[in-house]
C-alpha cells in the first residue's frame, strides 16, 4: 500500500492541514488495473476532523477494492473558502497522480460526513466556479479537473436555514454569516452540474436534522441529478461505519440497521 501524507498550503491553510493517501499498489497478479478512489472529508462541525470518520472508513473502502484518501482540512479559525480550496487541490492532485498510482481519473468520489458532507457537497456545487479554478492555477477550460465523479454524503450539514447546524456555519463563516449564509446554504445552489449523489441520514438525528438531506435531495431531483437517498429510522448523529470499529465511548454509534457503505461505482476490470 502507498501510504503517504502530503501537507496542504492553500491560501489560509493552517499548520497540520494535510492529505493522507491509502493506495493499493499495482500488481500484475490482480485483474484490476486502475481503481476508483474515495476521497474522504471527516466531520467535526468545522472545528476539527473526526478520527472516527477518517482512517477506519478509508481502510474499509480499501478492503472493498477502492483506493482511498483522507483530507484533514483546515477548520476554525480558518474560514470559507480555505477548506474548499484544500479539497479542490486534493482532487486535482490525485488526478495528476492517477497514472502513477493506477487511479481511474473518471471515478473519484468525494465522501463527507456531517460538516465534511457540507464540504464535499460544496465542491459538488461550486466545482465550476472561476474563483476555485483560479485558486488552483487553472484556466476556465480546466474546471473539469476539480469535478468529483460522485458524491457520497453521510448525514450531511446542508442548509443555513431553519434546520441548520448553527455551530458549523458559525465556524465556517465567522462574522460573515449575513454575507455568505445563503450562498453556503447548498440546497439553494444546486444545478444539473452537480455529480451523481448518494446520501444517507437517520430520522432520529438530533444534531443535524434529516431535513438537511431532504432539502438537498429535493433540489437534486428538481435539477435532474441522479440521486439515491436512504433514510433510516434509528441512529444518532455521527455513526461513521455504524459498527464496532467506529463505536463511541458511550456505544451510541453502533446501529446495524444503517448500511452506511454502499458502492457508488464498483472497481472495474480492464
Language-model-detected regions and their locations in the chain:
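Short beta-strand element of the alpha/beta-hydrolase
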Residues: 34-43
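Primarily recognizes the serine-hydrolase "nucleophile elbow" in alpha/beta-hydrolase
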Residues: 92-167, 181
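Short amphipathic alpha-helix adjacent to the substrate-entry channel of hydrolases
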Residues: 51-69
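Conserved small/polar residues in nucleotide/adenosyl-binding loops
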Residues: 262-268
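Catalytic nucleophile-loop/oxyanion-hole region of alpha/beta-hydrolase
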Residues: 49-51, 71-105, 256
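Short beta-strand/loop motif that positions the catalytic acidic residue
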Residues: 199-201, 205
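Conserved alpha/beta-hydrolase "acid-adjacent" motif
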Residues: 207-215
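N-terminal cap/lid segment of alpha/beta-hydrolase-fold proteins
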Residues: 1-32
Amino acid at each position: 500500500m502507498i501510504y503517504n501524507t502530503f501537507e496542504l498550503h492553500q491560501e489560509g491553510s493552517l499548520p497540520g492541514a494535510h492529505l493522507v493517501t491509502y493506495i493499493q499498489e499495482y500488481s500484475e497478479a490482480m485483474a484490476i488495473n486502475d481503481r476508483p478512489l474515495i476521497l474522504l472529508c471527516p466531520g467535526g462541525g468545522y472545528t476539527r476532523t473526526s478520527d472516527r470518520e477518517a482512517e477506519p472508513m478509508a481502510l474499509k473502502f480499501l478492503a472493498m477494492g477502492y483506493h482511498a484518501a483522507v483530507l484533514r482540512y483546515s477548520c476554525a479559525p480558518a474560514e470559507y473558502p480555505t477548506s474548499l480550496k484544500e479539497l479542490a487541490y486534493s482532487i486535482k492532485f490525485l488526478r495528476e497522480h492517477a497514472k502513477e498510482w493506477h487511479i481511474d481519473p473518471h471515478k473519484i468520489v468525494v465522501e463527507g460526513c456531517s460538516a465534511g458532507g457540507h464540504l464535499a457537497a460544496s465542491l459538488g456545487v461550486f466545482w465550476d466556479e472561476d474563483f476555485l479554478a483560479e485558486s488552483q492555477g487553472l484556466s476556465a477550460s480546466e474546471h473539469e479537473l476539480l469535478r468529483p465523479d460522485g458524491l457520497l454524503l453521510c448525514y450531511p450539514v446542508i442548509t443555513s436555514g431553519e434546520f441548520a447546524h448553527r455551530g458549523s456555519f458559525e465556524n465556517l463563516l465567522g462574522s460573515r454569516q449575513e454575507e455568505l449564509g445563503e450562498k453556503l446554504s447548498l440546497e439553494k445552489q444546486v444545478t444539473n452540474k452537480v455529480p451523481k449523489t448518494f446520501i444517507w441520514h437517520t430520522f432520529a438525528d438530533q444534531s443535524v436534522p434529516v431535513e438537511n438531506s431532504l432539502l438537498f435531495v429535493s433540489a437534486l431531483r428538481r435539477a435532474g441529478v441522479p440521486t439515491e437517498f436512504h433514510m433510516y429510522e434509528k441512529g444518532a448523529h455521527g455513526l461513521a461505519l455504524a459498527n464496532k470499529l467506529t463505536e463511541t465511548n458511550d456505544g451510541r454509534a453502533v446501529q446495524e440497521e444503517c448500511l452506511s457503505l454502499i458502492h457508488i461505482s464498483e472497481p472495474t476490470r480492464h
